[in-house]
Amino acid sequence: NFWANSPFVLPKNEILAESEFAAPTITKLIPILFSTSGASLAYNVNLVADQFQRAFQTSTFCNRLYSFFNKRWFFDQVLNDFLVRSFLRFGYSVSFEALDKGAIEILGPYGISYTFRRLAERISQLQSGSVYHYAFAMLLGSTPFVTFSRMWDSLSSWVDSRSSFILLVSSFIINKSSQE
């Protein structure tokens, strides 16, 4: 006798922790009652299922009922046409084209390369071929660098890196809008 009454506990031997907050015993026995009655019902239905199946197949009403529930009702077609396609269209036009693709084109490699190409074209228009123009351009470029590198300790509390980022992003947006 393997089980030796181990699943069964008398109500007088219940511990408070196991009594599931003082529920009545009949409440705890409901799963056993339903399991036993369900098993016996399934066994009895299985015995008469062959007779019921023959009666179901030969009856005109049951045959019509079966064919009614077996046909396609086009719920999936209605859902696809009206709900799913509108969500997919919105997702493609807003999130993909405007946000993802637009941000990648403006801030991604194509936007950066386009910006630098336009900047190089503008700078190349400044070239005249004279040495003193190049010397003057080098002087103009090195003056702020030398000035700010000497004064960085006193200016670092006034300079905010977020403003530099905003300036950089706005220049990309301005270049993108000017090309359109």
Curated annotation (Swiss-Prot):
It is a multi-pass membrane protein. The keyword DNA damage does not apply. GO terms for biological process: ATP synthesis coupled electron transport. The chain crosses the membrane at residues 131-148. It is found in: Mitochondrion inner membrane. One of its GO terms (molecular function) is NADH dehydrogenase (ubiquinone) activity. InterPro entries: NADH_DH_su5_C, NU5C-like. It is an enzyme of class 7 (translocase). Its main location: mitochondrion. It catalyses: a ubiquinone + NADH + 5 H(+)(in) = a ubiquinol + NAD(+) + 4 H(+)(out). One of its GO terms (cellular component) is mitochondrial inner membrane. Keywords: Electron transport, Membrane, Mitochondrion, Mitochondrion inner membrane, NAD, Respiratory chain, Translocase, Transmembrane, Transmembrane helix, Transport, Ubiquinone. Its EC number is 7.1.1.2. Pfam families: NADH5_C (PF06455). Belongs to the complex I subunit 5 family. Core subunit of the mitochondrial membrane respiratory chain NADH dehydrogenase (Complex I) that is believed to belong to the minimal assembly required for catalysis. Complex I functions in the transfer of electrons from NADH to the respiratory chain. The immediate electron acceptor for the enzyme is believed to be ubiquinone. This is NADH-ubiquinone oxidoreductase chain 5. The lineage of its organism: Eukaryota, Viridiplantae, Streptophyta, Embryophyta, Tracheophyta. The gene is ND5.
